[in-house]
Structures are given as structure tokens and as C-alpha cells.
């Protein structure tokens, strides 16, 4: 299981922007391959995504510098090492970079290598990736958080909240959950058409119409769920990604489509009213990533009612999560491998969350590739929830299809309503 060579290339992500793909070639000839995604709505403390900044090429978004780092320094440092010891490989990658935010080699270069090593190991063992990624956690098939109505930075419309998601918690298993979500997605399209609303899709495959308010978005989803023959609150519940850092300006949160602005306390009351009107079970990034006093209020007021997920707040960083746990901020963390940059550090964040009673939600990015690593990691870690977009665009459905394959291979329970237990 020793590394013969590591090589990288520039490929395109789902938005048509360059990203990096790495091949880890073992002495046996086995090739582990991984590519990395890119976010649009990003936390300020995420690990550094290295771009070329050459305006003459891909509008400055090329990743040839990161590719060269893989082909040169990283290749030289890892040649001859075994992929059996993931922590050692990731430690060497971090030491080689030697910056707090991986800005020297680039988190994209480091992550592509880290994940490709893990995949090479699975191939060497002739085992499915989810099995080799499992570290003793009870594996489950995750509840998909299906982002079928898009706004914010993920869509070119006037909707403030970034993601309106449906969660088929009442399904008996993952394939039925996927079927339920897909049927609702198609019914929603006809509901939108009937009302003369746009049915073009956003970056993550959800519809992105111009509508009058966040409540209207939830009403449209409610109508689609009912018309598809499912029970709102029993079969299907809602989750929101507010991405509030994108709405925060000069001390206030601006809901532009509703012509309203709120301070932290008022926005918490706004959420409380939404929760009393709709079966919302999860709110992600409900406040700005720097508004920690507001987050404490939010957690005190709503933390016993809904899942409060920190994305921009924690950026999959164990150090920042530790601060949040100490201060009683949020009760769940979004897991995005490219926010931290190695598989080992991602695992550390997951373990820290579990050890302190925080939930984990595995997540894609808005700029994705066909790589399905996060589907396997969601199952392996037993996190019970996954965000990987809507029910169209191959970059999104690739992850759902991988989960179907895993479900076929393994007799694993579907997380379902267990995610609601507090």
C-alpha cells in the first residue's frame, strides 16, 4: 500500500470554474482519485483555497499553482509512504504547508491528496470506501436534506434565505426517502409553473423563482408536499440554511425581499414565529459567524426546539468548535471537508462534536464535482444527515446514487425520525 507517485490536474467544477483533482498511484498500480469542491457562501475562517489570480486565464480562478504543489512538494514528501496510516499522511501534509490556514500549498491541493490516499487504501483492501472510512461509529443511512428551493448566494433571484430544504424523515429506508423527495421536487415544478413562477434551477439544483417572502417559499413547499401525497410534519419536515452572514450589514440582518431589517434578538423572534407556523427542525447559520453573543441567545431560546447548525460559524475546524462548545453556541456542526482541508481533521471535528452531544451534518459545496466521497463519509461516520443539493444536476444526484449503491451493499438502518431526538 505504498505510494509510488502523486499527480494532479486542473478540472472543472459544476459552475464551470477550475478545481483540482489528484491521483495517488500505488506501487501496485492501484490509483486512488479525488477532486475537491468550492463554496460560494464561505466562512471567513475556512482553510485557504489556492487560486492563480491570473486575470488572463479563467478570470483568475485557475488552480495551476495548487496542481504544481501536488506534483512537486507533495509528491516528493509522500513517495514511499503507506496509505494505511491516514493520520501520518495528513500530518505530513500540514507540516509541509506550515501555515494556520493551509495558504502555502492550498487546502484544495492538500485535500485532493488526502482524500485520494483514503480512496487508494480502500481499493487496495478491495473494500467499499464507506467500510474503510468507518472508525467504529454505528453506521446509518443518512436523512437527505434536499435543497429544492434556492435563494441567497446560490441563486440569481430576490429570495433572502439561501436554502429551503425538505427532509423525508418518515421514509422507511433511504431509497424511499429519495423517491419521496424526487416526487415532491417534480410536483413543486408544476406548482411554480401554475403560478407563473420561474422554474430555472440554481447552483445546487433547486428552483430559484422570484417570490415575495420566505413564508411564501415555505407555503409553496407545503403545497407541493400535500399534492405529492405526503404528510407535512410526519413524512416530511423542513430545514433552512439562512446563511445569515450574507444578510448581515452594519449591525443589522436585512431581509431585502420583505423590506425588513432585524437585530439579533428580533431575528431570533422571526425564527421562533416561523417554527411555530411550519415544521422546521433545523436552522443553519441563523446568525452571522461573528455574532457569538447572538448565537448564545439563539441557542438558549431555540436550542431545545430545533437543530442549530454552525457552518460559517465553525468551518469544520476543531479549534473553533471547541470554543463554541465551551460557550454553549449552536448544537450541531456542518461538516465540509474542504473547509478544513484533510480527512483526519474532518474526523477530529466529527468526534469532538459527538463527544459533546453536538450533531453532525455532512455537506457538499455549491461548486461540486462528480466525486462522491462525502456520501461514503456520511455513512461511515454515522452522522445521520447529508446535504447534497436538489434532485437534478448530476453533480448532486451522483451523491444520492452512491448512497443507493451503499444501501444495496449494506443492511444499514435509515436514520429517519431518530435525528429529531434531543
Swiss-Prot record:
List positions binding (2R)-2-phosphoglycerate. 162, 336, 365-366, 387
UniProt keyword terms in alphabetical order: Cytoplasm, Glycolysis, Lyase, Magnesium, Metal-binding, Secreted
**Which Pfam families has this protein been placed in?**
Enolase_C, Enolase_N
The pathway it acts in is: Carbohydrate degradation; glycolysis; pyruvate from D-glyceraldehyde 3-phosphate: step 4/5
Report the principal subcellular site: cytoplasm
Name the domain of life this protein comes from.
Bacteria
Q: Where does Mg(2+) bind?
A: 241, 284, 311
Where in or outside the cell it occurs: the entry states: Cytoplasm; Secreted; Cell surface
The answer to whether the entry has keyword Secreted is yes
What is the free-text note on the cofactor?
Answer: Binds a second Mg(2+) ion via substrate during catalysis.
Cofactors required: Mg(2+)
NCBIfam families cross-referenced by the UniProt entry: eno
Q: PANTHER family annotated for this entry?
A: ENOLASE
Query: Function, please?
Result: Catalyzes the reversible conversion of 2-phosphoglycerate (2-PG) into phosphoenolpyruvate (PEP). It is essential for the degradation of carbohydrates via glycolysis.
Q: How does it assemble?
A: Component of the RNA degradosome, a multiprotein complex involved in RNA processing and mRNA degradation.
Q: Give the protein name, as stated in the record.
A: Enolase
